[in-house]
Amino acid sequence: MNTNDFDFELPEELIAQTPLEKRDSSKLLIIDHRQKTMVDSHFDHIIDQLNPGDALVMNNTRVLPARLYGEKPDTHGHVELLLLKNTQGDQWEVLAKPAKRLKVGSQVNFGDGRLKATIIDELEHGGRIVEFSYDGIFLEVLESLGEMPLPPYIHEKLEDAERYQTVYAKENGSAAAPTAGLHFTTDLLKKIEAKGVHLVYLTLHVGLGTFRPVSVDNLDEHDMHSEFYSLSEEAAQTLRDVKQAGGRVVAVGTTSIRTLETIGSKFQGDIQADSGWTNIFIKPGYQFKVVDAFSTNFHLPKSTLVMLVSAFAGRDFVLEAYRHAIDEKYRFFSFGDAMFVN
């Protein structure tokens, strides 16, 4: 298939710049790809789409305040680093601006020297490997100096950084939020659990590759970014029990889908505890092995995320649903509305 097969016109005013006051007051488009039906609803009604005995699978990653502003001690030149992933120990892969000033051996100071970064390797496209030095605990230093790395299409200042975290965010490590989970409130999750739905958590640390457009025409030539994932034995056992009892595995967001399908592909459809790096690219033609239904936000044109949704529900029907969402003025992207796919 061709990248342009997943293109659509999106009015800029539909790109949500701020979150709604209430997380679960966003709109929800419920689609059934077998019945070819679409129903306009609101997110707090997602509970009606879940059955007793189902498992609702959520990504409990927490977004790091990963954007750092510092200066070179020799020239006092301003430098911006965006943390992408922890490679080992105190070493991180980062995106640097301006990258051309930062050669191997260069040093950058943050917060009057409370945090220092030394460049130890140069990568393409402005990437660098840095080693940090600091006193105390790295995450505490980062919390005091870093800023939340909002997506490039959000231009408004975020008043409350916690609104770019899910209410169940726990495991530090993401450069972006698993945005399908932003709609859930603690109260809504309690109601879902009281209905007899199993709440299951996994971890996938979201990288900035999630915003990277597909730059090739032929999808088979696309180089998918890799992200770290983890599923515990307790979570895996719950999911196996749910499947065996005839319940559904309902994923919250594309990151949960990618984790579950990575594991399903690795273990021939079985669900096992596992951790590692995944670069799975789910596109039309892929046979789903674990996920039975899911919720997700509305994604960028020509993105791998639109392709993933199309792999499950069919490209033509998904694009028809997107046209409906645009006509009905649904809000798009990270702070936007949601879709439930049966």
From Swiss-Prot:
Main location (coarse class): cytoplasm
Reactions it catalyzes: 7-aminomethyl-7-carbaguanosine(34) in tRNA + S-adenosyl-L-methionine = epoxyqueuosine(34) in tRNA + adenine + L-methionine + 2 H(+)
Subcellular compartments: Cytoplasm
BP GO annotations: queuosine biosynthetic process; tRNA wobble guanine modification
Documented EC number(s): 2.4.99.17
Keywords: Cytoplasm, Queuosine biosynthesis, S-adenosyl-L-methionine, Transferase
Gene Ontology CC, one term: cytoplasm
Keyword Transferase: yes
One Pfam family this sequence matches: Queuosine_synth
Function: Transfers and isomerizes the ribose moiety from AdoMet to the 7-aminomethyl group of 7-deazaguanine (preQ1-tRNA) to give epoxyqueuosine (oQ-tRNA).
Family, similarity comment: Belongs to the QueA family.
Subunit structure as annotated in this protein's UniProt entry: Monomer.
Entry protein name: S-adenosylmethionine:tRNA ribosyltransferase-isomerase
Gene transcribed to yield this protein: queA
